[in-house]
């Protein structure tokens, strides 16, 4: 049985249940669990942001959905968000089924720090297909400072094409008053 995803991350023959393997500098490969067939994957490269969408947690308390959606809208994403849990959001991004994954500090706990195990594997999968993963300030994620990303603030993962636009939107002051989080 494959993963329970709200989108189909499947082979062209309809086979479900896949594994993503990424090696720094060698790309990301998608492997079908049942057949063993594999192929390299690439991030969505289109500049048509009308077809892009945000990936977000089903559990809206896992982040700041108001700010996350405001940023997605500010960079032109208009499709309904793709809601799923776990690192499957990174998989959807790597396969081009989403263009952006944002996870900003909770409104209830603006000093919250992410756990490395929630992002390390997904980050390399996205980066190796040509996407980018940073924090809200554009800094690379620091996976070498313990079990939490204490040197980072939030997560911005993109197909690469949108990344600088997202960081620019985050620097805009007008997004923050309505979202109860400060820069």
Model-derived regions, located:
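An extended, acidic
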Residues: 11-13, 23-26, 36-183
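Phosphate-binding/catalytic loop of phosphoryl-transfer enzymes
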Residues: 1-35
């Amino acid at each position: 049985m494959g993963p329970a995803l709200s989108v189909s991350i499947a082979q062209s023959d309809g086979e479900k249940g896949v594994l993503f393997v990424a090696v720094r500098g060698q790309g990301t490969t998608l492997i079908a669990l049942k057949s063993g067939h594999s192929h390299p994957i690439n991030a969505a490269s289109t500049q048509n942001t009308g077809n892009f969408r945000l990936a977000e947690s089903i559990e809206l308390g896992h982040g700041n959905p108001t700010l996350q959606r405001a940023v997605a809208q500010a960079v032109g994403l208009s499709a309904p968000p793709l809601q799923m849990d776990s690192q499957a959001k990174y998989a959807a991004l790597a396969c081009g089924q989403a263009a952006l994954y944002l996870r900003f500090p909770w409104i209830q706990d603006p000093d919250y720090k992410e756990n490395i195990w929630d992002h390390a594997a997904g980050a390399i999968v996205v980066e190796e297909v040509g996407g980018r993963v940073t924090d809200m300030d554009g800094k690379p994620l620091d996976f070498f400072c313990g079990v939490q990303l204490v040197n980072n603030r939030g997560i911005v993962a993109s197909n690469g094409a949108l990344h600088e636009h997202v960081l620019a939107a985050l620097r805009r002051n007008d997004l923050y008053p309505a979202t109860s989080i400060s820069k």
